A protein has these predicted regions:
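FAD-site-proximal beta/loop scaffold in flavoenzymes
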Residues: 115-136, 207-280
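A short, polar/charged loop-to-alpha-helix boundary motif
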Residues: 355-369
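Rossmann-like dinucleotide-binding cores of NAD(P)H-dependent redox enzymes
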Residues: 137, 146-201, 301-306
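Mid-to-C-terminal Rossmann-like scaffold of FAD/NAD(P)H-dependent oxidoreductases
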Residues: 3-5, 222, 262-356
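Beta1-alpha1 glycine-rich phosphate/pyrophosphate-binding loop at the start
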Residues: 2-73, 153-177
Length: 370
């Protein structure tokens, strides 16, 4: 794009780093400045819970996902105070003029329980991992992906002391993702691992002094700094188009983009929600194309979740409908699969130790960019 000399990136997690890498790969030679309060080398977040007692801090650069120094990104080690549009429609990040701003601030965990641990940063994970061995019990509020991963990590660590309790105020394990369809599967794993599961029960107030409390009850897009009028989705994320351009009144805000967990892409009648690693990984390609005026990727990848729990490699691709019962299969190469279809069309697939089936579903569910 003509006149594009300085791009600001707010956040240096996976989505922000990939946006910088894709801009350079597409030929951008101008100035890149990034803001992030976490003053350390960018790292991958999923291992913080999956590998709570193992190699939980894995730098993105070591995985080939992007090295900010090597990409020539100047990093300001503080949170962006604001992103604003001037009366002349010029963008400023913390008072610094930029030609385009990419918002990649992710989603911050809910913090509503006094004294509870959350796992969002490497420091959060380190504090929790250090506290657990000295406790009599670990009480986890929330049976979503984070809560079940932490339960798995603690139960599988072979620690002699703490018992693990998993409390969920709804009646389902991973209810937001599966609407009750996987309760029997996960309950079997949890109970076999010795986890005490309490469904339909919020964690009661008042805790034993020797109990560790973990809040894993969801998150919200981290956008308090944004001083630009923009459309929001039901979960509070920024609404974008397929090129990650932030929308206001249904039209793109010039120069403003949002990637990863803080953004949901509106694709006709479908919404591709943030909150998933693969969206953070892939959004930068579309952003770079939009900023530089080059063709974007032909396909938009579907929503995808990966998890390692109770000795199993788990993958979910697509969005599970609440009104369709899954078909269960056992592929010839092993593992198991749950498939959601409507009128012969695949909507979502859950694989347990069946990566080949997941790969096929991923290809079937991608959307051609309109």
């Amino acid at each position: 794009m003509d006149g594009m000399e300085h791009v600001g990136i707010v956040g240096t997690g996976l989505a922000g780093v990939r946006a910088a890498a894709e801009l350079r790969a597409a030929g951008f030679t101008g100035k890149l400045t990034a803001w992030d309060a976490e003053d350390r080398e960018p790292y991958d977040r999923p291992p913080l819970t999956k590998s709570l007692f193992g190699e939980r801090v894995r730098p993105l650069a070591s995985q080939g996902l992007g090295d900010l120094a090597g990409l020539g990104v100047r990093v300001v080690p503080e949170a962006a105070a604001s992103v604003k549009l001037s009366p002349s429609r010029a963008l400023r990040v913390s008072g610094v003029a930029v030609d385009a701003a990419i918002l990649a601030t992710g989603a911050a965990p809910h913090r509503k329980m006094p004294g509870a641990h959350v796992v969002y940063t490497s420091d959060d994970a380190a504090r929790l991992a250090a506290a657990i061995p000295h406790s009599a019990s670990v009480r986890i509020a929330g049976a979503g992906w984070i809560g079940t991963e932490i339960a798995s990590a603690v139960a599988s660590a072979g620690l002699p002391g703490p018992r693990v309790e998993l409390w969920e105020s709804s009646g389902h394990i991973l209810g937001r993702s599966f609407h009750g369809a996987v309760d029997d599967l996960w309950l079997g794993w949890l109970e076999e691992s010795g986890v005490d599961v309490r469904l339909d029960q919020p964690l009661p107030e008042g805790q034993d002094a020797d109990a560790i409390l973990v809040q894993a009850t969801g998150s919200a897009p981290a956008l308090a700094f944004l001083a630009v009028e923009a459309d929001r989705t039901a979960r509070g994320a920024l609404a974008t188009d397929s090129l990650t351009r932030v929308l206001s009144g249904g039209s793109p805000v010039p120069g403003l983009y949002a990637v990863g967990d803080c953004a949901d892409a509106l694709l006709g009648e479908t919404t591709l929600e943030g909150g998933h690693w693969t969206k953070a990984l892939n959004d930068g390609k579309a952003t770079a194309a939009a900023i530089l005026g080059v063709p974007p990727p032909a396909y938009i990848p579907p929503v995808e979740v990966f998890s390692t729990q109770f000795g199993h490699e788990i993958g979910l691709v697509g969005t599970v409908p609440a009104d369709v019962a899954p078909a269960r299969e056992e592929p010839p190469r092993g593992g198991s699969v749950m498939r959601w279809e409507r009128e012969g069309r695949l909507l979502a697939l859950l694989s347990v130790d069946a990566p080949r089936e997941l790969s096929r579903a991923r290809k079937a569910l991608r959307v051609r960019r309109g």
